[in-house]
Design a protein with these regions (language model features):
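N-terminal intrinsically disordered, low-complexity, charge/repeat-rich segments that act as generic
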Residues: 1-78
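Non-DNA-binding regulatory cores of transcription-related proteins
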Residues: 81-140, 145
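Conserved hydrophobic positions within beta-strands
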Residues: 147-150
Length: 151
């Protein structure tokens, strides 16, 4: 199994890059929405005033951007070279079903043709695998996961 091990540094790098792209997309969307809102505010006509829905959308996007930046800070705290043997923040958890990276809720990243699922410490599946080691198992969503390796 060790020979097939994905590099935690590569997994972390892929997660950071995905998060950076997501943040850039949100920043671009927020900038475009602000441009639309503020250019419409300059128009005197009552019928061209920005809708409350657009303002609400802007607030939601700004809130989500704040959360994305928080998740990036979590990723930046992870030490790829730190060895782990229990499921905790920064661990790669290889199971008989999937490979997880305990980090942030990034969903899927592809590394060397393999899928790794990023999950946060708040995810329900993390709660059932937390503190477990290779050789242990857990049940989630009606599926039994056998932990093959933690690093």
């Amino acid at each position: 199994m060790i020979a097939l091990r994905l590099s935690k540094a590569k997994i972390l790098q892929a997660c950071v890059q995905k998060q950076e792209r997501t943040i850039e997309d949100f920043e671009r969307g927020i900038a475009e929405l602000k441009t639309q809102l503020y250019s419409q505010e300059e128009i005197e006509s009552q019928e061209h005033r920005p809708s409350p829905e657009r303002r609400e959308l802007l607030l939601r996007m700004e809130h989500e951007l704040g959360f994305l930046n928080y998740e990036m800070a979590v990723l930046r705290q992870i030490e790829a070279e730190k060895p782990l043997d229990v499921v905790d923040l920064g661990a790669v958890v290889v199971t008989n079903q999937r490979t997880f990276f305990i980090s942030t809720s990034l969903e899927r990243v592809e590394i060397e043709g393999r899928t790794v699922i990023g999950i946060s410490q708040k995810a329900p599946i993390y709660q059932v695998m937390k503190g477990k080691r290779a050789g242990e198992s857990f049940d989630y969503g009606g599926v039994r996961f056998a932990i093959l390796e933690v690093y």
